[in-house]
Structures are given as structure tokens and as C-alpha cells.
């Protein structure tokens, strides 16, 4: 097996045994970035010097007999996470040259675990988008077909993992931004429960919805990443003060009894939904059958407020974004427009030039929803719908352990196909965004390839803080599902 084909689990075993070195593995992946990223556009910043320095240090630690969970493993980070001394752009002109003085907590934990950071990946600006076409720097292409999008907003991370330019990556998920690109790129993506992973040092889009999570080659790799990045953080007021399990224990006993005793719900509102691609629906049914063969009891459940989810989300998320992004004004840091008449003119011109069209669209939407006279009509109603959606999931989980659905209504669409149709783009989040509003975990696992050679994923949702059941079911599907994606032919 070539070095770039190693999973995180496989690379870790070979590193600790001395069969490979972190420097060789890191060099191999940096060479792939150099060879392929001009076509893919997965990265905004590549830190080759820093990565090789960290890899050399990891090799020295291994030679001394030291061990750490991710020692010598090359990873990538979505460029929404602060990295000390390495620019963090959020794929926006307004932060094009911003270099943080501190690491996000998740980044700190990765470094403490011995990880090697190869670079920062592309995204839709500030995480606002579903295709990674909204970056101020360049678009990212799907490794399986360069004419198609990789999904978004964590499209750079998903494309980098799929193209074997890093062993694993971190993304962020506000309405499906880990799970949807993972599905489109044929990799595994986990959005943890809200509060499971510290948000400190993540540049906020919608603070009550955002969550950091792993994008990996396998479900086991996702569990290994979760063991490192999860846990309470006093720096983050939304971080949950709960015990952290060993997520790899989710797979204990699988070989002996499969998934016997697990009960999965399929929301009746998702069956035959308008806009659902027939291939996606067929792949979803086949994946459910695989889980049934492993012992899962599949039942019918209801999420009755599904039809209101997209509308509510696209009031709540832009409202929070309009507040979070109000801090970017050209005064203390980031881009500042020159040649302005006065302070107010500088504010206006800086924000007009610094933000892209989709970000400005959502700021306007959010500001309108929060304005006097409209707050109760829009934000208030959307908040009440969110409460109803949370109650729907709570009631459904009284009947089952996990909930199954497609990840996206269609496989990855062509670049430019929906760029002028934001409503169609927003509706593509119908299966994923409810999990963010409910704060529950969601996993995207590859389950099929379309007839046009594009990956399709299955989404597995669980009760809040029950990532274990989600990972266990995902592992079962991964072990038994035929026709899973291999390596893109770059």
C-alpha cells in the first residue's frame, strides 16, 4: 500500500512500529498537494515548513519510545479555525491577511496529541454555502469529477481527505457543512453533539448551530479524532461539562453480534420527498437493508415539522451571522478600504469590498429578521419552530436509537449549476440542518456510487451526546456495504 493510501489507524500503527516515518508520510502528502491541488483547490494555505518540522519532532519522540494519540499523523484544518502564526482567512477578503496569535482549542488538542498540520483548507466564505464556490480565493473541485462541486462549506477538507492529501481533517458544521461534503466526496464526516467539542478559536458563523468535527477515511478514524478533540473547555461557555467516553469502544463486540438490538427510525416525511434523486433514494433503501441484515430493527417515525425546517434555519442562522460579522469593520484587524471620506464611509466601503455576495445576502437577511417590527414575526417564530423540531426528535428517539436519512437530495451537482439559484442551494440542506437546530450528532457514511461515478452517503442521527450509537451503526454499514468509494483517479 502506498503511503498516501493509509488510514489514520493504519498510519498510526506503522509509525509506532517504526516501519514508516512521519517525515516520509508528511513529505508524500505534501508532494500530492503540490501535484494535484492546482486542479482541486482544496487548500488556501499550505504550511510545508511547519509540517516537516513537526514531523521531524514526532519521529524523534517515537524514537525515544514516546506515544500520543495522533503522534506523527498529518492533518488539515478548515480555514475557519484559528492557528497561531498561520493566517486564518475564513476564505474572505476581509480576513485575507489575518494571522491569529493563538490556536483554537481543537487545534491545541491536536498538537498536544502529536498531530502534524499540513495546511488550511478552502471553504465557502465564513462557512456560508453548500458548494465551496463562495470562497474569495478560488473554488474547490470534487476529486471524483473535477466538473462537480465537493459540497460545502467544508469542501476543501472533504476534497483533501478524499484525494489523499492528508490523513484526516477538521471541518465545521452549521447546517450540514461536514456531512454534505463528506457525502459528495465519498468520505466519513461527523458533526458531534452541540457542546461536545470546544468552539473556542473557531470563527463564528451562527454560534448556537456551529460545531467542529472530523472528516476522515473511515468511521474508526473519526472515533480516534473524537477522542482527541472532544471534552469540556472552560474557555467556551457552550462547552458541555460531561464525561468524555472512549469513542473507539463503540465498535466493541461488533464482530460477535453485529448491530443486534439496535432500533433505527426512518422519518416518513423523508420518503418520496420532492426533489429527492431516484438514485439517492435507491441507495438509501439499500443501505437501510444492509443495516437490517446486521440486526437493526427499522421502524417508521415522524418528524412533523420537517417542512418548516429550512425556512426556520435560514432566519436563525443569518440572524446570528449578522451579529457575529458586525465586528469586521476595518478598525482593529483585517482588510480596510483606503481612500474613504470619513469613518462611516470607511465602514461601508470596507464591508462592501471585504464581504462576498453570499455573505452580504445573509447579513441583510439576518439584519432584517432582527429589526424592530419584524423580530417577533421572523426570529421569534423561527425560534419557536426550532423548539418544535427539538421536541420532534425527542419524541422520535423515544421509539428508536438512531434515525436514518439521505445526506443530500442529489449527488454532487456541476460547478456553476446552482450558483445563481440560492433557494435551490438552501433546499439542498433539508436532511442535515435539523440536526444542528436540535443539537444532536450526525454522521455521513459512504453507501454507494451513482451511475455517473459520484459518491452517495447515508446520514445517521443519534440522541444528543450519543455519538457511540451513531458511530457503531456507521461502522456496521462501512463493513458490509458493497460498492463503496475507493481512490479517485486524479
From Swiss-Prot:
Active site residues according to the UniProt entry: 78 (charge relay system), 153 (charge relay system), 177 (acyl-ester intermediate)
Catalysed conversion reaction: L-glutamyl-tRNA(Gln) + L-glutamine + ATP + H2O = L-glutaminyl-tRNA(Gln) + L-glutamate + ADP + phosphate + H(+)
Any one GO MF annotation of this record: glutaminyl-tRNA synthase (glutamine-hydrolyzing) activity
Record EC number: 6.3.5.7
Pfam family, any one: Amidase
InterPro entries in the record: Amidase, Amidase_CS, Amidase_dom, AS_sf, GatA
NCBIfam families noted in UniProt: gatA
Official protein name in the record: Glutamyl-tRNA(Gln) amidotransferase subunit A
Organism encoding this protein: Desulforapulum autotrophicum (strain ATCC 43914 / DSM 3382 / VKM B-1955 / HRM2) (Desulfobacterium autotrophicum)
Lineage: Bacteria, Pseudomonadati, Thermodesulfobacteriota, Desulfobacteria, Desulfobacterales
Amino acid at each position: 500500500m502506498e503511503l498516501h493510501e493509509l488510514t489514520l489507524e493504519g498510519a498510526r500503527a506503522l509509525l509506532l512500529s517504526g516501519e514508516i516515518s512521519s517525515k516520509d508520510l508528511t513529505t508524500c502528502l505534501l508532494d500530492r498537494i503540490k501535484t494535484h491541488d492546482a486542479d482541486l483547490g482544496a487548500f488556501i494555505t499550505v504550511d510545508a515548513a511547519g509540517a516537516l518540522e513537526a514531523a521531524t519532532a514526532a519521529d524523534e519522540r517515537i524514537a525515544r519510545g514516546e506515544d500520543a494519540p495522533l503522534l506523527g499523523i498529518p492533518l488539515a484544518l478548515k480555514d475557519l479555525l484559528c492557528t497561531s502564526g498561520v493566517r486564518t482567512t475564513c476564505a474572505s477578503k476581509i480576513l485575507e491577511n489575518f494571522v491569529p496569535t493563538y490556536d483554537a482549542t481543537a487545534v491545541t488538542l491536536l498538537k498536544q496529541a502529536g498531530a502534524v498540520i499540513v495546511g488550511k483548507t478552502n471553504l465557502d466564505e465564513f462557512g456560508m454555502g453548500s458548494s465551496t464556490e463562495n470562497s474569495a480565493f478560488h473554488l474547490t473541485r470534487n476529486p471524483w469529477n473535477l466538473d462537480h462541486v465537493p459540497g460545502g462549506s467544508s469542501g476543501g477538507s472533504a476534497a483533501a481527505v478524499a484525494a489523499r492529501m492528508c490523513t484526516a481533517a477538521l471541518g465545521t458544521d452549521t447546517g450540514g457543512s461536514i456531512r454534505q461534503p463528506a457525502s459528495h466526496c465519498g468520505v466519513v464526516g461527523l458533526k458531534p453533539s452541540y457542546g461536545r467539542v470546544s468552539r473556542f478559536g473557531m470563527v463564528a458563523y451562527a454560534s448556537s448551530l456551529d460545531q467542529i468535527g472530523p472528516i476522515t477515511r473511515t468511521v474508526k478514524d473519526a472515533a480516534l479524532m473524537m477522542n482527541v478533540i472532544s471534552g469540556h473547555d472552560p474557555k467556551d461557555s457552550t462547552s458541555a461539562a460531561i464525561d468524555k467516553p472512549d469513542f473507539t469502544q463503540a465498535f466493541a463486540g461488533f464482530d460477535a453480534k453485529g448491530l443486534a438490538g439496535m432500533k433505527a427510525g426512518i422519518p416518513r416525511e423523508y420518503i418520496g420527498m420532492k426533489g429527492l434523486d431516484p438514485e439517492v433514494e435507491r441507495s438509501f433503501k439499500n443501505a437501510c437493508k444492509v443495516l437490517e441484515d446486521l440486526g437493526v430493527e427499522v421502524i417508521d417515525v415522524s418528524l412533523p415539522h420537517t417542512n418548516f425546517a429550512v425556512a426556520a434555519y435560514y432566519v436563525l442562522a443569518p440572524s446570528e451571522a449578522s451579529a457575529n460579522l458586525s465586528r469586521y469593520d476595518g478598525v482593529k484587524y483585517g482588510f480596510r478600504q483606503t481612500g474613504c471620506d470619513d469613518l462611516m464611509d470607511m465602514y461601508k466601503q470596507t464591508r462592501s469590498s471585504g464581504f462576498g455576495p453570499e455573505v452580504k445576502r445573509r447579513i441583510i437577511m439576518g439584519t432584517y429578521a432582527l429589526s424592530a417590527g419584524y423580530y417577533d414575526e421572523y426570529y421569534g417564530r423561527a425560534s419557536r419552530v426550532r423548539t418544535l423540531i427539538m421536541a420532534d426528535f425527542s419524541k422520535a428517539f423515544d421509539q428508536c436509537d438512531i434515525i436514518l436519512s439521505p445526506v443530500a437530495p442529489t449527488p454532487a451537482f456541476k460547478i456553476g449549476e446552482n450558483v445563481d439559484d440560492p433557494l435551490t442551494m438552501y433546499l439542498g440542506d433539508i436532511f442535515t440542518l435539523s440536526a444542528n437546530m436540535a443539537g444532536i450528532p450526525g454522521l455521513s457514511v459512504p453507501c454507494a456510487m451513482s451511475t455517473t461515478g459520484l459518491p452517495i452517503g447515508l446520514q445517521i442521527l443519534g440522541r444528543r451526546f450519543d455519538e457511540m450509537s451513531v458511530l457503531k451503526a456507521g461502522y456496521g454499514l462501512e463493513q458490509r456495504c458493497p460498492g463503496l468509494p475507493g481512490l479517485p483517479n486524479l
